[in-house]
Amino acid sequence: MAEVGGVFASLDWDLHGFSSSLGNVPLADSPGFLNERLGQIEGKLQRGSPTDFAHLKGILRRRQLYCRTGFHLEIFPNGTVHGTRHDHSRFGILEFISLAVGLISIRGVDSGLYLGMNERGELYGSKKLTRECVFREQFEENWYNTYASTLYKHSDSERQYYVALNKDGSPREGYRTKRHQKFTHFLPRPVDPSKLPSMSRDLFRYR
């Protein structure tokens, strides 16, 4: 995992000074090279067993993602992304994977799918860890976080595409979002294993 910082620094050219802090670690901006590296990371995660996760300590965080609109984000096995008001829902337990400074991917523990955003700003669950599944995690002044696509933004401005949930829990398209809207504000909430559905406890412990 030592080369991850160098690889993902090239995903976001706005991380001023980040590459210099990496010393002589080679940076690559070829989409093919990046996708290959993402595949390698995905493979390590999929092959992981309970004893294999020691090297990922501090890199993996299991959380619920609560939106200011009152919903927890869920990733379903069919690739659908939606919000629920149910605390500790089966598909609302998420794995936050730190890739580099401020860059993360989010995976559903039960569904095994990664949160992705396509060029239209639509959220979906991806079987593969691709560049569409990499987000910039930003801590805002109101103690909430925002999650912006590192791949897509408005072509006529610097405005980012953000992960967002509407007031009815449906996903809001990234092109319709702004950083200071409540739709885009999230709190990563701790997971209490005792509150998980019984069918999900083993997944939470071992996946």
UniProtKB/Swiss-Prot annotation:
Q: Where in the cell is it found?
A: Secreted
Q: Does this UniProt record's set of keywords contain Iron-sulfur? A: no
The protein's GO terms of the molecular function aspect are:
fibroblast growth factor receptor binding; growth factor activity
Name the GO cellular-component terms: extracellular region
Q: Tell me the CDD domains matching this sequence.
A: beta-trefoil_FGF16
Question: Phosphoserine modification sites?
Answer: 111
Question: SMART domains in the record, alphabetically?
Answer: FGF
Task: Supply the alphabetized keyword list.
Answer: Glycoprotein, Growth factor, Phosphoprotein, Secreted
* Carbohydrate attachment residues: 78
Q: Which GO terms describe its biological process?
A: fibroblast growth factor receptor signaling pathway; positive regulation of brown fat cell proliferation; positive regulation of endothelial cell chemotaxis to fibroblast growth factor
What role does this protein play? Plays an important role in the regulation of embryonic development, cell proliferation and cell differentiation, and is required for normal cardiomyocyte proliferation and heart development.
Q: Which family does it belong to?
A: Belongs to the heparin-binding growth factors family.
**How does it associate, per the subunit comment?**
Interacts with FGFR1 and FGFR2.
- What name is this protein filed under? Fibroblast growth factor 16
Could you tell me the gene encoding this protein? Fgf16
